[in-house]
């Protein structure tokens, strides 16, 4: 009974979270509102499309379920475009060890030449840093929620990430 009440209570809000792309330096590159759904394939597909258009060839993206997303991406209408631009889907370092060995050898960041010590866990670090944003946007209008999130990530990029690049 209590679960039904909770679902109804939170059901009045359309936005349930954000899906972000973070570069290896920690800059927020793209954000998408998740609307009345959990993590669905449409969010990373939209982000990949945006990044391919902005940055072009030879991009790689780490995702907790990068192995599954690789299949989704290749079967989508974006698949041909992603293959043409040599996009690679990878599994983040800490999540990859839950996958089977063949998946790890093919997708785990540890085994990909050229990535160095990158763990592709920038989104996890960013979400950890941005946890204080959630209570301030919980009851906001859609406009004010987007405004607060945009301001947070502008501040994050300019005054935290950019300022710390030279350290």
Regions found by a protein language model. Give the residues of each.
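Catalytic-core elements of nucleic-acid end-processing and repair enzymes
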Residues: 1-167
């Amino acid at each position: 009974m209590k679960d039904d009440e909770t679902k109804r209570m939170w059901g009045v809000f359309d936005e349930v979270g954000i899906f972000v792309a973070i570069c290896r330096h920690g800059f927020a590159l793209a954000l998408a509102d998740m609307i009345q759904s959990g993590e669905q394939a449409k969010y990373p597909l939209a982000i990949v499309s945006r990044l391919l258009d902005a940055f072009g060839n030879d991009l790689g993206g780490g995702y907790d379920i990068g192995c599954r997303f690789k299949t989704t991406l290749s079967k989508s209408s974006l698949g041909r475009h992603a293959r043409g631009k040599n996009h690679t889907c990878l599994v983040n370092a800490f999540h990859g060890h839950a996958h089977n060995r063949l998946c790890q050898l093919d997708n785990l960041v540890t085994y990909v030449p050229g990535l160095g010590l990158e763990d592709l866990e920038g989104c996890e670090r960013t979400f950890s840093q941005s946890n204080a944003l959630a209570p301030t946007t919980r009851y906001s209008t859609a406009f004010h929620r987007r405004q607060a999130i945009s301001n947070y990530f502008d501040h994050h990029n300019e005054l935290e990430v950019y300022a710390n690049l030279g350290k």
